[in-house]
Amino acid sequence: MEGLNISNQVFDLSPLDIIPSHLYITNAFFYENKTPGPRPFMQSSLLKESLYRALQNFPILLGHVRRHRRNAMQIVVDCDNLNLPLYEEQTHPQLHFRHLKDHQFHRDVWPKDANIIDPRASPNGELLQVHVHRLAEESGVVMVVRIAHCAVDAKGFVDFMQSWGWFARNHSHPEGDSWPRLLADRRVMYEYLPPDVQPAAPRSMWHPASWLLGLLSTLVVLFLGLYKRLLGDKTPPDEIESHLFSVPPHTLDRLRYTATCIDPSSRVSDHDIITALFTLAFAHTKHLLTCRTQTVTAIVPCDFRHRIGVPSNFTGSCAIGLYVSIPGSLLQTPLTAESVARAALLSRAVVDTADKVTIQTFIRRALRAIAFVGDKVNVLYATMVSQAFSNQSRLGFYEVDFGAGGPVMVAPMAYSNTVAVICPAPGPGGDGVGVRVFLTLRPEVMRMLLAKGFLDEFTDMIY
């Protein structure tokens, strides 16, 4: 990484970045060498050089996370003190890519150390980590990439990976107008929002309002810290268990038809069905463990780039969380196609309300929350939801191409308790594969869910 021509820059993070700032986004990419030959597959020098050029184009990943004012955060890029990425390579001479394919990429046969389960980001750690696992006889490569969530959202993650791949494919061409342009400056998003939905200018600490806000903020932060300690961390790797499920196309069609029979005027999406199915399964499990029947709340992300005109190549967090409440009455009956369909209709009704006013209201609330509690806001949000979702099904993970074609398999990993990630399915367009969901729960909850078979009628477990 010597010789990087980087200028000093400061990126002020938005409230939407600060909420998940304690986490990494992590994915494993499986690349098969389909044309074996004398040349090394996905050469180390090519990967490193193209990464160098991609970071030159996206310097936010070379910065350090810093506290700013009372509860704000920044990523500070200092050309004399760059936060260089972690880049490691391992060779596995006994593990052939064919073995992974024969076992349908079950994680039990992954390279050693490839399966990362801890989602937490170190406050002083690298914003980018890359672990390359080279398989026997140049048969393939497994690339595990982690990017700090404060720097990008899932779409920003994919955009950076595609940028890296572009520089790898065009390594011999000069940089010109065709190279990927990524927008990391958060002011890009604020340009599409009214002034009252933007961070206020800082006041003097001696201003009465600032002094009072500071006192209240300190008390709330102390309370949330104590609350978190009493409840336990939501993310420790030894207290979470994850599995990858697949919801077949015929199941989605059946549940969609059931919803149409209940309300012919509504058209539920695959996302609505997944939200309903996994939230109900989780709620039924918690009901058995706690013997309490109550309304359950799922938080469903809604990317608003296209809704208010934010450029698609903006890489910061750009989604609001919509709250879908499912009444306890749906837990009084077994988990059936009808109960899932009714819950999916509730999800669709909420998603349909996501207009510009809803987006602005959410961001105002996030601004107020950050002003009071800073990055402890994730504790606050955790108390408000039963199940959280991340919809990544439309993102171009399978278009990340370093010159040898896209990956055969992309696997999400290392998510927090109660998070369900809706993944893109492998294959051209994912047609006929259905929807894959990576679910993370506490072990006792996951064991109960699997033992009772709440998902058996609707899903297949991949691993």
UniProtKB/Swiss-Prot annotation:
Pathway: Mycotoxin biosynthesis
Catalytic machinery residues: H149 (proton acceptor), D401 (proton acceptor)
Biological processes, Gene Ontology terms: helvolic acid biosynthetic process; secondary metabolic process; secondary metabolite biosynthetic process
Source organism superkingdom: Eukaryota
Record-listed E.C. numbers: 2.3.1.-
MF GO annotations: acyltransferase activity, transferring groups other than amino-acyl groups
KW Signal (keyword) present: no
Induction per the UniProt record: Expression is under the control of the secondary metabolism regulator laeA.
Cross-referenced InterPro entries: CAT-like_dom_sf, Plant_Fungal_Acyltransferase
Keyword annotations of the record: Acyltransferase, Transferase
Function: Acyltransferase; part of the gene cluster that mediates the biosynthesis of helvolic acid, an antibacterial nortriterpenoid. Protostadienol synthase helA cyclizes (3S)-oxidosqualene to (17Z)-protosta-17(20),24-dien-3-beta-ol (protostadienol). The synthesis of protostadienol is followed by several steps of monooxygenation, dehydrogenation, and acyl transfer to yield the final helvolic acid.
Family: Belongs to the plant acyltransferase family.
This protein's name: Acyltransferase helD2
